[in-house]
Each structure stands twice: as structure tokens, then as C-alpha cells.
Amino acid sequence: AQETSPDAGQLLKRVRQGATLQENKDIKGQIRKRSVKIPFSMSLRGNLIAFQYQLNNVWNRFDLKFKDRGQEILSWKDGKAGVLPVAQYAVPIAGTDVTYEDLSMRYLYWPQAKIVRDDAASTVKGRDCWIVQIPNPNSGVGQYAWVRVWIDKENGAMWQVDGIDRRGELAKRFMIDSVMKLKDGSWFFKRMKVDVRDPSNPRRTVSVSYVDMDSPE
């Protein structure tokens, strides 16, 4: 008998809760590319998630703000927040392969997610996963026309994200190397590999970064 698919939106909600459940507490980590290490933190503050990263001993802040319809990214300068131009969503942070859009994971909040059946590709790291496909509601904004997210059928952890460009080609792959269990029983990634593909040959990796998360205190 074929198993019944859960609601794709509910699956994404569980993944999002893993990132934001530590309300008003910072989740800390670092972005690595070769010898470059960029410390960062993220925390839920009311209707936004605040991100901070350290470059040349200076902390920089940007926020993912939730509105009635959709989200926007705010950038802080001289103590004031302004809307980050959408052209900068795809700008790498501090020379890494991780962009503002990537770190904010704004795609997890896009509407119209659906589960796609691809039994041949549904296993990641030996884990049986639901594959959730999410179209970009504004395909002219950011790097991805749509993304695919692999979510563990048993524990709800996210194992892989594929960012697909406007040509339908794989632009970037986020692979979860390891996960950690949080105090509320949910799962969140401990290490994520960011794999940038060659636009002329999407099977070829041209650059790699890592995102390492500290265990919440």
C-alpha cells in the first residue's frame, strides 16, 4: 500500500521551528571557506529573525522580517535598519559561498510547497525522506526559481536542499553532514556543506563552504 503523504507546509513548519525555537536566545556558529572563518549568530525576536556575522572584528547585522504577505531582508547600518535591495540577496557573505538569502533560509517560508514523489532520490545518508518542492513566489528575486528540500520521514530533520536556477539547473546544494537533537526534541543541523555548481556544467562543483552550528546552551 502506498503511504499517505503529509502536508508539505506542515513539514516545512517543523523544520522552521528547529531554527527558531530558542526564542530570544542566540544560536551561534561559523561559516568556513578554506582558511576563512566567519562567526555568526541567529535569534528569533518577535516578527523577525536577527542574524549577525563578524568580519574584521566588526559585527554586522541583517534581519529576516515577516510581513502579512511574504518576507523581506533588512540590513543594519549605523544603528538603523533599511530594506536590503533584492539584488543583494544573492551577494556572498564575507567572501564565502553563503549568501544573505542562503543564511536566512527564506525559501522555507515560501507558499505553495508540495511533496514530489521520486523514490529513486528519496534517500539521503541512508535516511528515508519526503522531498518538498517549493516555487519562488517572485522568481525574479534571488538565486533560485525553486528549491527542493529533503525532510526525514521519521524525525523531521532537514538533510538536503537543492537550489535550482531559472534554467532548471542545480545552482547550489546544501548537504547536512550531521544533526543535533535540541531540548524540545526537535532536530537541527550541526554541520552543513554548501556545494556551488558550475553554471555551464551543474554536475561539477566549483566551490565549497561549510556552516557549523554550536550546540544550544
Label every model-predicted segment:
Residues 3-78:
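N-terminal mature ectodomain segment of secretory-pathway/periplasmic proteins
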Residues 3-14, 20-21, 66-145, 166-168:
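Flexible, processing/modification-adjacent segments and terminal tails
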Residues 28-30, 38, 49-53, 59-62, ...:
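Intrinsically disordered, low-complexity segments enriched in polar/charged residues with Gly/Pro
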Residues 29, 35, 47, 57, ...:
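Intrinsic-disorder/low-complexity loop/linker signature
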Residues 35-40, 56-64, 78-85, 139-144, ...:
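Short, surface-exposed beta-strand/loop "edge" segments at domain boundaries and coil↔beta transitions
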Residues 39-45, 63-66, 113-122, 177-180:
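Short, exposed beta-strand/loop patches in secreted or surface proteins that constitute
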Residues 46-52, 69-74, 91-101, 181-187, ...:
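Short, surface-exposed linear segments at secondary-structure transitions and domain or protein termini
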Residues 125-217:
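Gly/Pro-enriched, hydrophobic low-complexity segments
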